[in-house]
Amino acid sequence: GKSLLANCFMEECGLNTVAVRRDKGGDAFINSIAQAFAKAKKEAPAILFLDDMDKFANEDDSRCDAPEYVAVQAGIDDVKESDVFVIATVNEIRKLPDSLCRSGRFDRKIGVWAPTAADAEAIIAHYLSGKRVSDDINMKDLTKMMSYHSCAELETILNEAAIRAAFARKDSIGMEDMVGTVLKQQYGASEDVPLNSEGAVKKTALHEAGHLVACEILSPGSVGFASLLRCGGFVHNCNVLPNSCEAIVALAGKAAVEMQYPGQLAEGCGRDIKRAVNCIREAAANVGKMGFSLLDVESDRSVCMSESLNVRSEAVVQAELERCYNRAKSILSRNELFLEKITEAFIEKKTLLYSNIQRIRSATVKDSTEIAQETVSQYHNEDEDLDEARKESIRR
């Protein structure tokens, strides 16, 4: 996106342009930087374009005095009195020396952020406009299923889908090609579920359905893609949830299996539990959600957590884990039909798109406003109970 924006700018200006990219190393590259500035000065009015400038040097972040950056600074200073306009693209501006980024060398900084959902939909439509696509392409599903950080990433996926369709000797790109490409490119998923017993597949489907249902109830419309076509399966959440909700969603897979199979402990939940613990600890450390009793006030310079703080922290983390697990079970029990239908859909289709999920949700879940009210009411009482549990843990 950054290089594309710069190229469009240079094309619209209609001036002579000189581009510098790191295509060689050592002294040869440093010399090419000096030569590029000299050429731009000679051909003025001109634009000098430094592409991916943060990759000009291989020094670590603490060494910003690399000779490549010194050469750029010297070049900018040399063309100051000439009609040479210098622009650059960078991915990590923190890697550049402050002296290079200050006013007088680079006066304007323009942030180019990752595409929003609306941006991604427009970008996908643009790239597909020159390709033959089938009628089953659903733009909303396409946008929701992808994790996108740049235009180039979206373009790569769409080109790979076109190659896949051509390899299969199809006349057009279909939704199947898109789904298969996204699974492979972004999730590292094989296209066939490993041969497991029917019971194992059902438990995996139930586990992922638990995550999905909890996520959809806490944040309606947030799940854009989910599949069993990877070891353990996955659920792609399009929205960022608060840490407390993330912890509930993380434990909902375990809750779903243990509710369906009473007396059995769900296997393979270690990663989910670790994720929930991390969410709880982050909420306690960063925003003080668990109260000031978990803040280490003995020394603001202490490197390690004090023993007393560690005892208090672990007690509250365990209590919070229990609360989140119980909230997950409560959500799933109140949305049993939704959980059942999602599990069945997982077993049948293996991969669920946004439209599949929303179709099942609308048929099985009551109005989200009503759910939200019920949730707030029920969780208020649970929070009061937890406060007492925390106080008792701290007293102990």
Set out the residue ranges of the language-model regions.
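Soluble catalytic regions of large protease machineries
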Residues: 200-206, 212-396
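Active-site scaffold of zinc-dependent metalloenzymes
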Residues: 163, 176-196, 228-230
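Activation segment
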Residues: 57-59, 97, 182, 213, ...
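Walker A/P-loop NTP-binding motif of AAA+ ATPase domains
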Residues: 1-143
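Residue-level signature of catalytic and energy-coupling elements of molecular machines
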Residues: 10, 51, 72, 106, ...
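Short, function-defining helix-loop hinge/capping sites that tune catalysis or transport
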Residues: 59-60, 98, 158, 215-219, ...
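Generic recognition of well-ordered alpha-helical segments
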Residues: 35-38, 74, 122, 126, ...
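Conserved C-terminal "switch" segment of AAA+ ATPases
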Residues: 85, 98, 112-177, 253-258, ...
